[in-house]
Amino acid sequence: MNRNLRNRICVLAALFMMLLPAGCSWNGETRSREYANTPKGNFMALWTIMDEHYCFFDFKKETLGVDWDEVKVRYAASISDDLSDRSLFEILCKMIGELRDGHVNLTSQYDYGRNWSWKTDHPANFSKDLQDKYLGTDYIIGGNGYSYRVLDDNIGYLVVESFESAMSDNRLNIMFNNMALCNGIIIDIRDNGGGQLTASESLASRFTEKKVTVSYTCYKTGPGHNDFSKLYKNELSPAEYDLRWIKPVVVLTNRGCFSSANDFAFTMKALDNVTLMGD
């Protein structure tokens, strides 16, 4: 097997583990092991990295019936030392695709291996044309990734397309000033692919006047599927500004919400004045 592809597969698999949420982090011994520079060796390297570092095997078994040991046996039958690099890559992509996890991807010069069935197998539940109709042409661009306006029925409409960029405190202050007389706010995060957790937290912190426990995190502590730390609270603190919103809020979601957009949704769900609508 081409050494460059072999190195790329192993390194990217390790990088994938580093890119998982903090609850999935564990610096174990897998990356220091030596595997033969063959299709079988690379197959076992990737399977083992996943086996010892991935956090959600019990959940995937319960909800999808995924048995990771059975997956190894089934896909190992397709691995032989005369496989081409491309064929090996495609098999490895199918193997990790069994998990149906949008954060689990493998890339190479041939393609970007992914499983997006969590979105593509379901209705979009979103119309950009309808969103544009409500925004109109005289909307305000608050910053990179979000725009807003006050609708005719005195409801604020905030479209957050991305959390890729930081949300300036000054710009958020201006936005909430502009919508101060509104009876409520609709926050539309449909098809928001995520971005920075700090950006989503900055926005969410404007909707509470007290510290709120929004979720719990445990950390991967070893190679076993159930090697986790105790639970730690994740708390949302109110923004250190007078401009906070305590009137009703509706957050619109769909399956296009991903990563930090999901974080924003479940954080907002913990607040008393917020209603989530969508899937």
Please place each PLM-identified region on the residue numbering:
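Flexible, low-complexity junctional segments that flank or bridge functional domains
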Residues: 23-219, 224-235, 248
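Short, conserved helix/loop micro-motifs enriched in His/Cys and acidic residues
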Residues: 240-252
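Short, well-structured beta-strand/strand-turn elements
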Residues: 185, 258, 271-279
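Active-site neighborhood of thiol-dependent amide/isopeptide-bond enzymes
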Residues: 191, 251-260
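Bacterial Sec-dependent N-terminal signal peptides
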Residues: 1-31
